[in-house]
Amino acid sequence: MPYMPYPQDDAPYSGNDPRVASFIKKFRDAEYIFDHWKDKYEEAYEYTMPQRESFYEETIGERRTDKIFDETAVVGIQEFASRLQAGMVPTYGRWANFEAGSEIPDDAIPLVNEQLDAITEYVFEVLGGSNFNQEVHEAFMDLAIGTAVLLVEEGDSLNPINFQAIPLPRVMLNNGPDNKIDTIFRTRYINYNRLMAAYPKAEMSPEMLKKISDDGHAKAKVVEGVFKVYDKPNEEIYKYCVVCMDMQEMILEKELKGVGANPYIAFRWNKASGEVYGRGPVFNAMAAIKTTNLTVELILQNAQMSISGIYTFEDDGVINPENIVLQPGSLIPVAPNSRGLQALPAAGRFDVAQLILGDMRANIKKALYMETLGRPEGTPMSATEVAERMSDLSRQIGSSFGRLQSEFVTPLLRRVIRI
Protein backbone atom coordinates (compact mmCIF):
# COMPACT_ATOMS: atom_id res chain seq x y z
CA MET A 1 0.00 0.00 0.00
CA PRO A 2 1.45 3.42 -0.87
CA TYR A 3 2.94 5.31 2.05
CA MET A 4 1.05 8.59 1.96
CA PRO A 5 0.67 10.18 5.42
CA TYR A 6 -0.64 13.37 3.85
CA PRO A 7 -2.99 14.26 0.99
CA GLN A 8 -1.40 15.16 -2.31
CA ASP A 9 -4.22 17.37 -3.56
CA ASP A 10 -4.90 20.22 -1.17
CA ALA A 11 -8.45 21.42 -0.69
CA PRO A 12 -9.39 24.73 -2.34
CA TYR A 13 -8.81 27.73 -0.11
CA SER A 14 -11.98 28.59 1.76
CA GLY A 15 -10.70 31.20 4.22
CA ASN A 16 -10.77 34.98 4.16
CA ASP A 17 -7.06 35.76 4.48
CA PRO A 18 -5.96 37.47 1.22
CA ARG A 19 -2.32 36.67 1.97
CA VAL A 20 -3.01 32.92 2.02
CA ALA A 21 -5.20 33.19 -1.09
CA SER A 22 -2.43 34.99 -3.00
CA PHE A 23 0.16 32.48 -1.75
CA ILE A 24 -1.88 29.47 -2.85
CA LYS A 25 -2.55 31.08 -6.25
CA LYS A 26 1.20 31.49 -6.86
CA PHE A 27 1.81 27.96 -5.59
CA ARG A 28 -0.74 26.54 -8.03
CA ASP A 29 0.86 28.45 -10.93
CA ALA A 30 4.27 26.98 -10.08
CA GLU A 31 2.74 23.53 -9.58
CA TYR A 32 1.16 23.68 -13.05
CA ILE A 33 4.59 24.30 -14.61
CA PHE A 34 6.20 21.64 -12.43
CA ASP A 35 3.67 18.99 -13.50
CA HIS A 36 4.87 19.31 -17.11
CA TRP A 37 8.41 18.37 -16.05
CA LYS A 38 7.67 15.56 -13.61
CA ASP A 39 7.71 12.72 -16.13
CA LYS A 40 10.95 13.91 -17.76
CA TYR A 41 12.80 14.29 -14.48
CA GLU A 42 11.38 11.06 -13.03
CA GLU A 43 12.62 9.07 -16.03
CA ALA A 44 16.08 10.61 -15.69
CA TYR A 45 16.16 9.84 -11.96
CA GLU A 46 15.08 6.23 -12.54
CA TYR A 47 18.02 5.54 -14.88
CA THR A 48 20.74 7.63 -13.22
CA MET A 49 19.87 8.14 -9.53
CA PRO A 50 17.38 5.39 -8.64
CA GLN A 51 17.95 5.77 -4.90
CA ARG A 52 16.79 9.38 -4.88
CA GLU A 53 13.33 10.42 -3.76
CA SER A 54 10.66 9.86 -6.40
CA PHE A 55 8.45 12.56 -7.87
CA TYR A 56 5.46 10.26 -7.26
CA GLU A 57 4.16 8.27 -4.33
CA GLU A 58 6.16 5.27 -3.19
CA THR A 59 6.19 2.68 -0.43
CA ILE A 60 8.63 2.59 2.47
CA GLY A 61 11.81 0.74 1.51
CA GLU A 62 10.68 0.32 -2.07
CA ARG A 63 13.31 -1.06 -4.42
CA ARG A 64 14.06 1.33 -7.24
CA THR A 65 17.07 -0.39 -8.79
CA ASP A 66 15.19 -3.25 -10.45
CA LYS A 67 15.18 -1.40 -13.78
CA ILE A 68 18.94 -0.81 -13.77
CA PHE A 69 20.91 -3.33 -15.84
CA ASP A 70 23.82 -1.08 -16.84
CA GLU A 71 25.56 1.18 -14.32
CA THR A 72 27.39 3.46 -16.77
CA ALA A 73 25.04 6.40 -16.19
CA VAL A 74 24.73 5.74 -12.44
CA VAL A 75 28.51 5.88 -12.01
CA GLY A 76 28.88 8.63 -14.59
CA ILE A 77 26.62 11.08 -12.80
CA GLN A 78 28.64 10.62 -9.59
CA GLU A 79 31.85 11.31 -11.49
CA PHE A 80 30.28 14.30 -13.24
CA ALA A 81 29.38 15.87 -9.88
CA SER A 82 32.83 15.15 -8.44
CA ARG A 83 34.66 16.58 -11.47
CA LEU A 84 32.46 19.68 -11.49
CA GLN A 85 33.06 20.23 -7.78
CA ALA A 86 36.82 19.76 -8.16
CA GLY A 87 36.92 22.13 -11.13
CA MET A 88 34.60 24.88 -9.87
CA VAL A 89 34.53 24.81 -6.04
CA PRO A 90 37.42 22.52 -4.97
CA THR A 91 37.30 21.20 -1.42
CA TYR A 92 39.23 23.40 1.04
CA GLY A 93 40.45 25.50 -1.87
CA ARG A 94 40.23 29.25 -2.34
CA TRP A 95 38.31 29.28 -5.60
CA ALA A 96 37.37 32.99 -5.66
CA ASN A 97 38.92 36.35 -4.80
CA PHE A 98 37.30 39.64 -3.87
CA GLU A 99 38.93 42.63 -5.52
CA ALA A 100 38.20 46.34 -5.77
CA GLY A 101 36.02 47.38 -8.68
CA SER A 102 36.37 50.23 -11.13
CA GLU A 103 34.40 52.61 -8.89
CA ILE A 104 37.17 52.64 -6.28
CA PRO A 105 39.74 55.48 -6.69
CA ASP A 106 43.13 54.30 -7.91
CA ASP A 107 44.97 55.46 -4.80
CA ALA A 108 42.58 53.50 -2.53
CA ILE A 109 42.67 50.21 -4.47
CA PRO A 110 45.70 48.66 -2.64
CA LEU A 111 44.16 49.27 0.79
CA VAL A 112 40.72 48.03 -0.31
CA ASN A 113 42.23 44.91 -1.89
CA GLU A 114 44.12 44.19 1.32
CA GLN A 115 40.90 44.37 3.33
CA LEU A 116 39.02 42.30 0.76
CA ASP A 117 41.75 39.67 0.86
CA ALA A 118 41.23 39.28 4.61
CA ILE A 119 37.48 38.96 4.03
CA THR A 120 38.07 36.35 1.32
CA GLU A 121 40.29 34.35 3.67
CA TYR A 122 37.63 34.38 6.39
CA VAL A 123 34.82 33.45 3.96
CA PHE A 124 36.66 30.36 2.76
CA GLU A 125 37.66 29.47 6.30
CA VAL A 126 33.96 29.40 7.20
CA LEU A 127 33.10 27.43 4.05
CA GLY A 128 35.81 24.88 4.79
CA GLY A 129 34.47 24.30 8.30
CA SER A 130 30.84 23.99 7.20
CA ASN A 131 28.94 21.23 5.40
CA PHE A 132 29.25 23.04 2.08
CA ASN A 133 31.37 20.40 0.36
CA GLN A 134 28.96 17.56 1.19
CA GLU A 135 25.83 19.42 0.17
CA VAL A 136 27.18 21.00 -3.01
CA HIS A 137 28.04 17.53 -4.33
CA GLU A 138 24.41 16.48 -3.88
CA ALA A 139 23.30 19.66 -5.62
CA PHE A 140 25.67 19.04 -8.54
CA MET A 141 24.16 15.57 -9.01
CA ASP A 142 20.75 17.23 -9.40
CA LEU A 143 22.40 19.73 -11.73
CA ALA A 144 23.40 16.87 -14.04
CA ILE A 145 19.67 16.33 -14.58
CA GLY A 146 19.12 20.03 -15.15
CA THR A 147 18.13 22.00 -12.03
CA ALA A 148 19.51 22.21 -8.49
CA VAL A 149 18.53 24.19 -5.38
CA LEU A 150 20.85 24.95 -2.46
CA LEU A 151 19.54 26.41 0.80
CA VAL A 152 21.99 28.66 2.68
CA GLU A 153 20.89 29.43 6.23
CA GLU A 154 22.43 31.23 9.16
CA GLY A 155 23.63 28.83 11.83
CA ASP A 156 25.00 29.29 15.34
CA SER A 157 28.34 30.23 16.88
CA LEU A 158 29.78 26.76 16.21
CA ASN A 159 28.44 26.45 12.66
CA PRO A 160 27.88 29.97 11.31
CA ILE A 161 26.41 28.73 8.03
CA ASN A 162 24.32 25.66 7.22
CA PHE A 163 23.92 24.38 3.68
CA GLN A 164 21.23 22.00 2.49
CA ALA A 165 20.70 20.59 -1.00
CA ILE A 166 16.93 20.53 -1.49
CA PRO A 167 15.63 17.50 -3.45
CA LEU A 168 14.05 18.54 -6.72
CA PRO A 169 10.74 16.72 -6.00
CA ARG A 170 10.28 19.13 -3.06
CA VAL A 171 10.88 22.33 -5.05
CA MET A 172 8.75 24.33 -7.46
CA LEU A 173 10.01 27.34 -9.41
CA ASN A 174 8.62 30.14 -11.53
CA ASN A 175 10.02 32.96 -13.63
CA GLY A 176 9.56 36.67 -13.16
CA PRO A 177 8.99 39.45 -15.71
CA ASP A 178 12.72 39.47 -16.54
CA ASN A 179 12.62 35.72 -17.34
CA LYS A 180 14.74 34.94 -14.26
CA ILE A 181 13.71 32.71 -11.37
CA ASP A 182 12.00 34.95 -8.82
CA THR A 183 9.66 32.47 -7.10
CA ILE A 184 10.76 29.39 -5.15
CA PHE A 185 8.48 27.04 -3.23
CA ARG A 186 9.68 24.27 -0.96
CA THR A 187 7.35 21.59 0.39
CA ARG A 188 8.08 20.05 3.79
CA TYR A 189 6.30 17.53 6.01
CA ILE A 190 6.78 18.24 9.71
CA ASN A 191 5.06 16.98 12.84
CA TYR A 192 2.72 19.60 14.24
CA ASN A 193 4.50 19.53 17.60
CA ARG A 194 7.78 20.43 15.88
CA LEU A 195 6.57 23.44 13.94
CA MET A 196 7.77 25.88 16.59
CA ALA A 197 11.21 24.25 16.57
CA ALA A 198 11.39 24.60 12.79
CA TYR A 199 10.01 28.16 12.81
CA PRO A 200 10.71 29.80 16.21
CA LYS A 201 9.12 33.10 15.12
CA ALA A 202 5.92 31.50 13.83
CA GLU A 203 2.58 32.93 14.91
CA MET A 204 0.00 30.25 15.65
CA SER A 205 -3.75 30.74 15.70
CA PRO A 206 -5.88 29.15 18.45
CA GLU A 207 -7.00 26.48 15.96
CA MET A 208 -3.38 25.64 15.15
CA LEU A 209 -2.43 25.46 18.83
CA LYS A 210 -5.37 23.13 19.47
CA LYS A 211 -4.25 20.92 16.58
CA ILE A 212 -0.75 20.79 18.04
CA SER A 213 -2.14 19.86 21.44
CA ASP A 214 -4.63 17.24 20.23
CA ASP A 215 -2.73 15.65 17.34
CA GLY A 216 0.86 16.82 17.62
CA HIS A 217 2.41 13.72 16.06
CA ALA A 218 0.45 14.06 12.83
CA LYS A 219 2.28 15.26 9.71
CA ALA A 220 1.64 18.80 8.53
CA LYS A 221 2.22 19.80 4.93
CA VAL A 222 4.17 23.05 5.11
CA VAL A 223 5.12 25.14 2.08
CA GLU A 224 7.82 27.80 2.24
CA GLY A 225 7.70 30.47 -0.42
CA VAL A 226 10.17 33.18 -1.44
CA PHE A 227 8.99 35.83 -3.90
CA LYS A 228 10.87 38.79 -5.30
CA VAL A 229 9.18 42.15 -4.73
CA TYR A 230 9.37 44.64 -7.60
CA ASP A 231 7.91 47.69 -5.83
CA LYS A 232 11.33 49.34 -5.54
CA PRO A 233 13.41 48.77 -8.70
CA ASN A 234 16.73 49.80 -7.15
CA GLU A 235 16.43 47.53 -4.12
CA GLU A 236 16.60 43.76 -3.78
CA ILE A 237 13.58 42.76 -1.70
CA TYR A 238 12.04 39.32 -1.13
CA LYS A 239 9.00 38.19 0.77
CA TYR A 240 9.36 34.97 2.77
CA CYS A 241 6.17 33.15 3.76
CA VAL A 242 5.37 29.83 5.44
CA VAL A 243 1.89 28.33 5.05
CA CYS A 244 0.47 25.19 6.64
CA MET A 245 -1.51 23.81 3.71
CA ASP A 246 -3.59 21.40 5.81
CA MET A 247 -4.85 24.16 8.10
CA GLN A 248 -4.71 26.79 5.31
CA GLU A 249 -2.96 29.17 7.65
CA MET A 250 0.07 31.44 7.22
CA ILE A 251 2.28 30.94 10.26
CA LEU A 252 5.20 33.16 9.24
CA GLU A 253 5.72 36.17 7.00
CA LYS A 254 8.72 38.44 6.80
CA GLU A 255 10.53 40.73 4.38
CA LEU A 256 14.10 40.05 3.29
CA LYS A 257 16.04 43.10 2.12
CA GLY A 258 19.45 43.56 0.59
CA VAL A 259 21.94 41.72 -1.58
CA GLY A 260 22.16 38.05 -0.62
CA ALA A 261 18.92 38.10 1.37
CA ASN A 262 17.35 35.19 -0.52
CA PRO A 263 18.32 31.94 1.29
CA TYR A 264 17.50 29.76 -1.75
CA ILE A 265 19.95 29.51 -4.64
CA ALA A 266 18.41 27.89 -7.73
CA PHE A 267 20.75 27.22 -10.64
CA ARG A 268 20.55 25.35 -13.93
CA TRP A 269 23.03 23.71 -16.30
CA ASN A 270 21.27 24.83 -19.46
CA LYS A 271 17.76 25.72 -20.53
CA ALA A 272 15.60 26.50 -23.52
CA SER A 273 14.36 30.04 -24.01
CA GLY A 274 11.26 30.79 -21.95
CA GLU A 275 11.51 27.65 -19.81
CA VAL A 276 11.82 27.65 -16.02
CA TYR A 277 13.56 24.34 -15.38
CA GLY A 278 16.95 23.41 -16.76
CA ARG A 279 18.14 20.63 -19.02
CA GLY A 280 21.36 18.92 -17.99
CA PRO A 281 23.79 16.61 -19.79
CA VAL A 282 21.73 13.59 -18.72
CA PHE A 283 18.90 14.86 -20.96
CA ASN A 284 21.26 14.71 -23.94
CA ALA A 285 22.27 11.15 -23.10
CA MET A 286 18.85 9.68 -22.23
CA ALA A 287 18.48 7.88 -25.58
CA ALA A 288 21.87 6.18 -25.17
CA ILE A 289 21.19 5.44 -21.49
CA LYS A 290 17.89 3.69 -22.22
CA THR A 291 19.32 1.83 -25.23
CA THR A 292 22.29 0.58 -23.21
CA ASN A 293 20.07 -0.48 -20.34
CA LEU A 294 17.74 -2.41 -22.67
CA THR A 295 20.64 -4.04 -24.54
CA VAL A 296 22.20 -5.34 -21.32
CA GLU A 297 18.82 -6.63 -20.19
CA LEU A 298 18.42 -8.55 -23.46
CA ILE A 299 21.97 -9.91 -23.19
CA LEU A 300 21.22 -11.22 -19.70
CA GLN A 301 18.02 -12.84 -20.92
CA ASN A 302 19.92 -14.42 -23.82
CA ALA A 303 22.62 -15.62 -21.43
CA GLN A 304 20.01 -17.20 -19.19
CA MET A 305 18.54 -19.01 -22.19
CA SER A 306 21.99 -20.23 -23.21
CA ILE A 307 22.77 -21.54 -19.73
CA SER A 308 19.44 -23.10 -18.74
CA GLY A 309 18.18 -23.68 -22.29
CA ILE A 310 14.75 -23.87 -23.89
CA TYR A 311 13.53 -27.31 -24.96
CA THR A 312 10.91 -28.73 -27.31
CA PHE A 313 9.28 -32.15 -27.11
CA GLU A 314 6.77 -34.19 -29.10
CA ASP A 315 3.35 -34.15 -27.50
CA ASP A 316 2.97 -37.95 -27.61
CA GLY A 317 1.30 -38.33 -24.24
CA VAL A 318 4.36 -39.91 -22.63
CA ILE A 319 6.37 -36.87 -21.58
CA ASN A 320 4.75 -34.83 -18.84
CA PRO A 321 6.54 -31.45 -18.61
CA GLU A 322 5.17 -30.93 -15.11
CA ASN A 323 7.21 -33.88 -13.81
CA ILE A 324 10.49 -33.20 -15.62
CA VAL A 325 13.44 -32.08 -13.50
CA LEU A 326 16.53 -31.04 -15.50
CA GLN A 327 19.40 -32.07 -13.26
CA PRO A 328 22.28 -34.59 -13.39
CA GLY A 329 21.08 -38.18 -13.11
CA SER A 330 17.49 -37.44 -14.16
CA LEU A 331 15.57 -40.16 -16.05
CA ILE A 332 13.08 -38.77 -18.55
CA PRO A 333 10.65 -41.26 -20.16
CA VAL A 334 10.17 -40.95 -23.93
CA ALA A 335 7.95 -42.79 -26.41
CA PRO A 336 9.46 -45.30 -28.89
CA ASN A 337 10.89 -43.61 -32.01
CA SER A 338 10.50 -40.23 -30.31
CA ARG A 339 13.24 -37.62 -30.34
CA GLY A 340 12.59 -36.73 -26.70
CA LEU A 341 13.69 -33.31 -25.50
CA GLN A 342 15.39 -31.09 -28.10
CA ALA A 343 17.30 -27.94 -27.13
CA LEU A 344 16.15 -24.81 -28.95
CA PRO A 345 19.12 -22.74 -30.18
CA ALA A 346 19.37 -19.28 -28.59
CA ALA A 347 18.51 -16.34 -30.81
CA GLY A 348 20.78 -13.32 -31.11
CA ARG A 349 24.54 -12.82 -31.11
CA PHE A 350 26.49 -11.56 -28.16
CA ASP A 351 29.23 -10.02 -30.29
CA VAL A 352 26.77 -7.73 -32.12
CA ALA A 353 25.25 -6.62 -28.81
CA GLN A 354 28.72 -5.83 -27.45
CA LEU A 355 29.38 -3.59 -30.46
CA ILE A 356 26.20 -1.64 -29.71
CA LEU A 357 27.09 -1.41 -26.02
CA GLY A 358 30.54 -0.03 -26.76
CA ASP A 359 29.17 2.80 -28.86
CA MET A 360 26.34 3.63 -26.46
CA ARG A 361 28.57 3.66 -23.38
CA ALA A 362 31.02 5.93 -25.18
CA ASN A 363 28.15 8.32 -25.99
CA ILE A 364 27.04 8.36 -22.35
CA LYS A 365 30.55 9.10 -21.11
CA LYS A 366 30.98 11.81 -23.71
CA ALA A 367 27.69 13.46 -22.70
CA LEU A 368 28.80 13.44 -19.04
CA TYR A 369 32.31 14.73 -19.95
CA MET A 370 34.01 11.54 -18.73
CA GLU A 371 36.18 10.94 -21.82
CA THR A 372 38.20 14.16 -21.86
CA LEU A 373 41.52 12.30 -21.52
CA GLY A 374 40.61 9.27 -23.60
CA ARG A 375 40.33 5.66 -22.55
CA PRO A 376 42.94 4.50 -20.03
CA GLU A 377 43.60 1.27 -21.96
CA GLY A 378 44.55 3.19 -25.11
CA THR A 379 47.88 4.66 -26.19
CA PRO A 380 48.99 7.46 -23.83
CA MET A 381 48.36 10.91 -25.27
CA SER A 382 50.97 13.55 -25.81
CA ALA A 383 50.97 16.81 -23.86
CA THR A 384 49.76 18.65 -26.96
CA GLU A 385 46.78 16.34 -27.35
CA VAL A 386 45.89 16.67 -23.66
CA ALA A 387 46.01 20.47 -23.93
CA GLU A 388 43.88 20.40 -27.07
CA ARG A 389 41.30 18.11 -25.45
CA MET A 390 41.04 20.35 -22.38
CA SER A 391 40.69 23.38 -24.64
CA ASP A 392 37.88 21.61 -26.49
CA LEU A 393 36.22 20.79 -23.16
CA SER A 394 36.35 24.47 -22.20
CA ARG A 395 34.57 25.39 -25.42
CA GLN A 396 31.91 22.72 -24.85
CA ILE A 397 30.98 23.77 -21.33
CA GLY A 398 31.77 27.48 -21.59
CA SER A 399 28.14 28.61 -21.81
CA SER A 400 27.09 26.34 -18.94
CA PHE A 401 29.91 27.62 -16.73
CA GLY A 402 28.86 31.17 -17.55
CA ARG A 403 25.36 30.38 -16.35
CA LEU A 404 26.72 28.75 -13.18
CA GLN A 405 28.82 31.84 -12.54
CA SER A 406 25.75 34.10 -12.57
CA GLU A 407 23.19 31.72 -11.00
CA PHE A 408 25.34 29.85 -8.48
CA VAL A 409 28.77 31.28 -7.64
CA THR A 410 27.87 34.98 -7.38
CA PRO A 411 24.61 34.49 -5.37
CA LEU A 412 26.38 31.98 -3.11
CA LEU A 413 29.21 34.34 -2.20
CA ARG A 414 26.80 37.24 -1.71
CA ARG A 415 24.70 35.11 0.64
CA VAL A 416 27.73 33.91 2.62
CA ILE A 417 29.10 37.44 3.00
CA ARG A 418 25.71 38.69 4.17
CA ILE A 419 25.50 36.02 6.87
Where do the language-model regions lie?
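Extended, helix-rich architectural segments
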Residues: M1-I212, G216
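Charged, low-complexity surface segments at secondary-structure and domain boundaries
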Residues: Q8-P12, A96-N113, E121-G129, A266-I289, ...
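Structured, contiguous alpha/beta core segments that scaffold functional sites
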Residues: D10-N16, V20-S22, E153-L326
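Acidic/proline-rich low-complexity IDRs
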Residues: Y32, I299, G340-A343
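Long amphipathic alpha-helical segments
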Residues: A73, Q78-A96, P105-N113, K257-F267, ...
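A broad, structural surface signal
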Residues: E114-D117, E121-F132, M141-I145, V149-V152, ...
